[in-house]
Amino acid sequence: MPGTPVSDLSAATAVDATALLPLPVARPSAPAMVRGKLYIKTHGCQMNEYDSAKMADVLAASEGLELTDDPEEADVVLVNTCSIREKAQEKVFSQLGRWKALKAGGKPVIIGVGGCVASQEGEAIVKRAPYVDLVFGPQTLHRLPELIRARRESGKSQVDISFPEIEKFDRLPEPRAEGPSAFVSIMEGCSKYCSFCVVPYTRGEEVSRPFEDVLVEVAQLAAQGVREINLLGQNVNAYRGAYGADAGDAAQYADLGLLIRTIAQIEGIGRIRFTTSHPLEFSDSLVDAYRDVPQLANYLHLPVQAGSDRILSAMKRGYTALEFKSKIRKLRAVRPDISISSDFIVGFPGETEADFEKTMKLIEDVGFDQSFSFVYSRRPGTPASDLQDDTPEAVKQARLARLQAHINAHAASISQSMVGSVQRVLVEGPSRRDPNELTGKSENMRPVNFPGNPRLIGQFVDVLITEAMSNSLRGRIQLDDSAH
């Protein structure tokens, strides 16, 4: 990549992030009145959750649509799809079949399909379900108002699944905070082409948002009371955000480590997270950020997928189990008590019992706190879909159960070890278990429930952990130093 990588520069060279807030941003403002209802059904990852929120923002600003939980009362219904799991397409068409009745009696409901299944299927969705009005990809959600208008004017279904680089971020309304924690997408796509994965084909190659654009969005959210920023990307630690290209100068590039350092300088931001990472891109610069930036949460999600080098090679992951463990050792040298979660695929084509035992050995060596683990799901069009898969389903399910039981037991022991400790918790709102209590998350992503005044929502508090439950912690606020 041309230009100077910012990771080679000191953090002091970064722009003053707090000064970015007053900069004008050419984005549509919210309408003065509600002109209709919008229903969105979201499947899949946090990127899809983020995209769905942006769809709502775009349609609120341009069409005056207000979100509803009831598709029956909606004027526009959208499904934001995920294609990671098997039979994803069939699930989408089942959903669409249920929505077909919404048009009964001639009601002018707009039905749209977005996300990764839309990218994969395109026109085929309309051919199979001609009552679908819109098909759009993750990179064209900002064009929803234009697509809706074109559908109404022409009477024809509209399909736009192109990959227009990073254009959508220039066309989105200003971000709206919905609580003390917010997601910020910093890049799109993936260029790793793992043999089992559809993401490069559905979301395109890696494209990073410009450095200053990300900082503007974070500053806007901080001004609205956001205290925790979650940086998003399919391969978020491959971030290379251009900056400094004015007057024909060669652009420089900020890596994720420097982006984190700069966000930490923005007033009000007390915690930073990021997901999802790829071990190949887990650099020394990022390890240094964990060492130097206290706002960077004491938690890392780093998908390893398998512990067998033979299977990792077949997956085209680009690293060995030893190299993965080496990165973890470097990280724990600067954050000894960091919690690490991961992704695992069990039963990848050709996985033997010996391969699986190597995965279990890696799990034991690293001590993962949490996992997202699944039996291998064949995705059409990926290289792995051509591999012979002769492991019985019962064997795969037994391996998965054993893997999950091991990690869950370790996670329970970590939770138990937290009893008696004081944890810094961002208060998110009332507890779902007991609305008279508050809830928030610890640094290592554990829900913590505790008595407290609702006025603390949006603040960090120190909570003494008194009990470890199966999926959460209980505690009480430390009165001597309760808020930061």
UniProtKB/Swiss-Prot annotation:
MF GO annotations: 4 iron, 4 sulfur cluster binding; metal ion binding; N6-isopentenyladenosine methylthiotransferase activity
Domain MTTase N-terminal: 36-153
Cofactor note: Binds 2 [4Fe-4S] clusters. One cluster is coordinated with 3 cysteines and an exchangeable S-adenosyl-L-methionine.
Keyword annotations of the record: 4Fe-4S, Cytoplasm, Iron, Iron-sulfur, Metal-binding, S-adenosyl-L-methionine, Transferase, tRNA processing
Major location (coarse): cytoplasm
EC number: 2.8.4.3
Protein name (database record): tRNA-2-methylthio-N(6)-dimethylallyladenosine synthase
Organism: Xanthomonas axonopodis pv. citri (strain 306)
Gene expressing this chain: miaB
